[in-house]
Amino acid sequence: ANGFAGLKPTHGLLSRDGIVPLALSFDTAGPMARHVYDVAAMMNVMVGVDPADEATLASEGRYDTDYTAFLDADALDGARIGVARDFLGYDDEVDWIIEAGLDAMRAAGATVVDVRYPAWLLEAKAQYYQTIRWREFKPQIEAYLADLAPGYPRTLEEMIERARKILAAPPEGGVPNPTRWTLFEQELNTGTPDDYLYRAMYDHGLPLVRANLEGLLDANDLDAIVYPTSPTRPGQAGVYRGSSSPNPSPSATNLANLSGLPDLIVPAGYTSNRLPVGISFFGRPFSEGRLFALGYAFEQATKVRRDPVHAPALPGETIRR
């Protein structure tokens, strides 16, 4: 809900060296910018094998040197796009914006077909994600903290203690998220990467997720699958609404994490109260170039992005659009 373009790349395409870990099985860097062109240009200087991150070895020989070369305003003409209907039907305004975007794709020459994700995957994806993330966080965050300067926490227990102090006396204007503190406790006490459940999920569950999603793309002969990046409109900034909203909805974005496959977000429109809605283009491993082409064509066909009204140019500045 930011009103700009962004890419969650194929896992291993970009180095994670120096990034605070949440779960290295899912973590990745990714560029964000006003337009798809800017995101593609940023990728040119971000890709490459990094000796400090062994995951990038998977990208050797598979990354491109100029992602802007893929940008084509006519890329939707002849493309075959799947729309994941499982993530629509939770917010009328979001649905309307996405349907308008699908109409724009059709008008640009794309064939748009409905697809459905396997029911077991929709039911199990949260458990898969939590099983991996909760068990990886403690050892990985502590390995990261060990390299910091003196004065910083060294263990998850120390992080929890500092979090409690912040929660007891929040900074002025701050709204602490109690769910984050609760997750610290769960991540402290929920197994390790050595236990059988983690090994089962990591060795068998994640490859199964990836195989099913790649199979969905292949079986329907798709260039990409699209869905609302968030099936419901954004909440009010600075107001914590708890772990469940009045109209809870599933999210497709964690499937990109579970599978390690790329997800390009492009502005799709705005709600009646001017909040941004994004559309995700999901594809095969190392298909970033094709996703950039499709996302750029969609961006040029719709031209819906607006500059933020609360951050105008400062005196003497000119914002390049």
For each predicted feature, which ranges?
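Short helix-loop capping/hinge segments that flank enzyme active sites or metal/cofactor-binding pockets
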Residues: 70-84, 134-209, 267-275
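Structural helix-boundary/capping segments
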Residues: 1-85, 99, 103-107, 146, ...
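A short beta-alpha structural unit
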Residues: 86, 121-130, 164, 234-235, ...
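Generic recognition of stable, solvent-exposed alpha-helical segments in well-folded globular domains
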Residues: 34-41, 83, 93-100, 132, ...
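Glycine-rich, small-residue loops and helix-cap segments
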Residues: 124, 177-321
